[in-house]
């Protein structure tokens, strides 16, 4: 089972409009399904926000993908897992140290308690990140069925 199927099976997904949402609120919203599934604690998002405030928007990658996470074995990480969130509007994370604007509308929020599982998850995510048609389909997703359909239509190499 691929990472997208695992996200849907765990219920770790959400879809937002994103209008007027700050990056801090987007990070919080991206953790809500993970809280509900017992993957992270309610205040886990605060640690992610603290890391981004300290180090800048290092969690935002090409193709408007954000991968919010904290340091390994952070307090509040109850299980190793991934959450998915799609936003109809771009979420502004500000500028990086080079003055480049960082925005995201596809979020993969990470939680880690097991380094081997965590590395496997990151490896699978990197395959997803390099699959432009899949990322485009995920950005447009509005339901768990859309996530699964995108995974089926644009499979990644294992």
Go through each PLM region and give its residues.
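Cytosolic covalent-transfer regions centered on His/Cys nucleophiles
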Residues: 1-158
């Amino acid at each position: 089972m691929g990472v997208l199927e695992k996200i849907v099976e765990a219920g770790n997904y959400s879809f937002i409009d994103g209008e007027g949402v700050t990056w801090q609120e987007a990070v919080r919203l991206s953790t809500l399904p993970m809280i509900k599934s017992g993957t992270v604690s309610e205040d886990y998002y605060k640690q992610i926000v603290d890391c981004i405030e300290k180090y800048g928007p290092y969690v935002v990658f090409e193709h408007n993908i954000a991968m919010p996470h904290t340091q390994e074995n952070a307090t509040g990480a109850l299980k190793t897992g991934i959450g998915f969130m799609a936003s109809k509007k771009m979420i502004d994370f500000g500028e990086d140290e080079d003055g480049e604007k960082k925005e995201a509308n596809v979020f993969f929020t990470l939680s880690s308690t097991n380094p081997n599982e965590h590395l496997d998850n990151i490896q699978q995510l990197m395959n997803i990140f390099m699959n432009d048609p899949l990322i485009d389909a995920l950005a447009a997703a509005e339901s768990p069925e859309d996530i699964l359909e995108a995974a089926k239509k644009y499979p990644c190499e294992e």
